[in-house]
Regions:
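Rossmann-like dinucleotide-binding core of oxidoreductases
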Residues: 145-148, 154-216, 220-222, 303-318, ...
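Hydrophobic/aromatic residues located in beta-strands of well-ordered beta-sheets
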Residues: 34-36, 104, 148, 189, ...
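FAD-binding core/adjacent interface of flavoenzyme oxidoreductases
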Residues: 1-7, 74-182, 248
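Short acidic/His/Gly/Ser-rich catalytic and metal-binding motifs that mark active-site loops
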Residues: 43-46, 113-116, 257-258, 295-296
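A Rossmann-like FAD-binding core segment of flavoenzymes
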Residues: 31-35, 72-88, 92, 99, ...
């Protein structure tokens, strides 16, 4: 393609959206400079962290060095953590210096809200990194029995900013693992959520099916009560307190801390406001994909890797149109694809604006 001078692209992040952005640029003939900013040149495959407690995956299986990827696609890696943005001067601020850009793709991911009392001290956040999966594995191995509570919440100011699917996988996966080990009878499993219908994004039929499966597996539920506190051995809610020797909780999400100094338009939930083309309104050279963005769409719009990929692809195609001076009319497809894995079987959930499909089978299990 015919690149103009204003085509130095900078990408923030090293996750799904960021890597899809790189691939989409090169696939569509972009041959100019690409710089990717991230703390480490590593892609972490968080979706498979559900298999760490069972030993099916280890850290080295899920942390993929990006050196060859960068070399193959001619990407300059810049080591740093973003601290702010100077959009007037087209500069990204990091703890390792500033990086200038002509076009910017933000794919830095979000962060979990950790404001509830006791959440930092007494809770494992399953998708907060590989270390969380390892901590769960190690603590579970040391337990002779007890109560394990697993749940998720949301961002009250940003309904779409939640990630509940992996918690269902941990619930069913732990049940299966403990049965395999012959010690399920020594443990009580509790699924909890402040939402009366947790997992509603997956569709009403999916929620009913997931809760029915819990009952079948003798997994207790504690639903519809606002959480007040996590203690060392219990969870306190407005509906009462229940014991927990090991607590896994996925809180709602918000944007990264540096957004407060970015000058970008933020939603009530703390994420960058974006349009259906993954562009930031009012900023002609800034695009966004994934968990750090607040996108238009149905209430079930997912915060998941697949959606980040779709947003990155649309955003980059619009970026390339802007560079070429042609109409930028690309919009990301809205769809949810989730395979709820339970170690020995799985449930496929698919949803788009026209349909919702649920399929229970073994075909997707490795």
């Amino acid at each position: 393609m015919d690149n103009r001078e204003d085509s130095k692209v900078v990408i923030i992040g090293a996750g799904f959206g960021a890597l899809t952005a790189v691939k989409t640029l090169r696939k569509n003939g972009f041959s100019d400079s690409i710089t990717l900013i991230a703390p480490k040149p590593i892609f972490t495959y968080i979706p498979s962290a559900i298999w760490i407690p069972s030993g099916l995956r280890k850290r080295e299986d899920l942390e993929i060095p990006l050196d060859n990827f960068f070399k193959r696609l001619n990407v300059e890696y810049f080591k740093g953590s973003v601290t702010g943005l100077d959009s007037e001067n087209n500069s990204v601020k990091t703890d390792n210096g500033d990086v200038s850009y002509d076009r910017l793709m933000i794919a830095s991911g979000g962060r979990f809200i950790q404001k509830l009392p006791g959440i930092k001290e007494n809770v494992i956040i399953p998708c907060d990194g590989i270390s969380a999966g390892e901590e769960l594995r190690d603590r579970l191995a040391k337990m002779d029995g007890g109560t394990i509570a697993l749940g998720f919440g949301g961002n009250p100011k940003e309904p779409a900013a939640m990630r509940g699917g992996p918690v269902f996988e941990f619930v069913y996966g732990l049940d299966t693992l403990l049965r395999r080990e012959g010690r399920r009878d020594k443990f009580k499993l509790i699924f909890f959520s402040p939402a009366p219908e947790p997992g509603k994004k997956l569709g009403p039929k999916a929620v009913a099916g997931l809760l029915k499966e819990m009952k079948k597996r003798n997994i207790e539920t504690h639903l519809g009560n606002k959480i007040k506190e996590f203690t060392t051995d219990s969870i306190v809610t407005e509906g009462g307190e229940f014991k927990s020797d090991l607590t896994l909780f996925m809180p709602g999400m918000t944007g990264p801390m540096w957004l407060a100094k970015s000058g970008l338009p933020l939603s009530a939930g703390g994420m960058v406001v974006a349009d259906s083309g993954a562009r930031v309104p009012g900023f002609k050279n800034i695009y966004i994909a994934g968990d750090s963005g607040s996108f238009p769409g149905p209430e079930w719009l997912p915060k998941q890797a697949h959606m980040a990929d779709l947003q990155a692809e649309a955003g980059i195609k619009n970026m390339l149109s802007d560079i070429a001076g042609t109409p930028a009319e690309h919009k990301f497809k809205v769809e949810l694809i989730c395979i709820v894995d339970s170690l020995n079987t799985g449930v496929l959930v698919y949803r788009d604006v026209k349909r919702a499909i649920i399929l229970k089978c073994r075909i997707f299990h490795w």
